[in-house]
Amino acid sequence: MTMQLLHISIIALSFIFASTLQAERLLHLRLGEREWDTFPTQSESDSLDHTFNVDEDNMPRSFSFEQIDVKQQWTLAINSKTIGKLPRDENRMVVFFDIPEGVLKSGNNKLTLVQTGRKTPDDIYFGYLRFYNVSTQEHLSQREISIQVTDQATKQGTPCRLTILNSRGTLAGTGNESTNTTAVREGVIYTSTGKVTLKVAPGKYTIYAGRGMEWSLDSVKVDVTTASATTAPPHYPLAIRREVDTAGMVACDTHVHTLTYSRHGDASLPERLITVAGEGIELPIATDHNLHINYAPLVNQLGLNRYYTPVIGNEVTTRVGHFNIFPVPDGAPLPNHTLETWKEIAASIQDQTGASAIILNHPRDVHGGITPFSPARHNDVTGRSQLGWEFPATAME
């Protein structure tokens, strides 16, 4: 079953806005069985098939929509030409895509959204479709907002996370791109200095500043609907403070990956290091797969060494389990990740690195066809291996 949306026309409302979908709501789509019982018993459709009409003299160049709870691969196409895939993210967010030249035609056009790839059940919400007659970057760079976040105790700028919500409480897009002091995603900007000039489309926003669980939040409501693009950006100072006394303790993330080295996720190494500071982590462990990566040189180069101490580790990724190990001496040889038993793997880890911490990761997940804590390999009642193996780790994740 395919959901046929209401017909719309492209109407030039201004240089920037081109059209809005008449159905101002979110549609519930599902392929397969209901994912969780928190979703309605019946979805509205398993896919989206939307016809819209455009004028040859006013062709849209980009469009946006809102999505919620996307976990699997959903592909957007216009006139059977793939535009892109929905970000796999459960948050409610506004997503933008540019429309490549030659995709649209004068008259009727068709936008489709279908789940592709592995057909795993996935309930999602999609809607508030809008078209624009400028590029995404142009649309999201019409206005600027100056933000400075300081530590209330020191009165100095502080690393933090900025969350930008639109008037519906949805993560809003910005025209910002990641720099050597910022890491940018939909509705979120991490800053290592506390200082950011936001680029946004005209509208009403709520901007939150925080720095992980130990710090307070501050926020400001901003209306840039009618502000002139030629005037100086309005400036909003925000201040946060440490609220949890953690004397004698350290905030540690023992499982840190980067796209740069692990080839999954989407954070480059510089982006990841900025987010570590922005979340108040004080002891991050580098655990890229079967690699010993020293983050310290780039941490120092980015001026982040006053906020945390990076530790070399490794997610030793084997057929019979994934093990985060640390600390690892700089230059230490890699453990043998091709070994087939926990005893051999533990011995290789000790021989090559001497790591004192070994964490067995996600033992109930399937990787390479093997689940370390499946009933065939692990007795839940006794806590012992069905294979007679000794537990090799000092902790589990």
Specify the residue positions occupied by each region the protein language model found.
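Bacterial N-terminal signal peptides
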Residues: S9-A18
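Beta-strand-rich recognition domains
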Residues: A23-V149
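Aromatic sugar-binding surface patches on proteins
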Residues: N91-F97, T182-G194
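Extended, charged catalytic domains and RNA/DNA-binding interfaces, predominantly
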Residues: T158-L165, G169, G187-E397
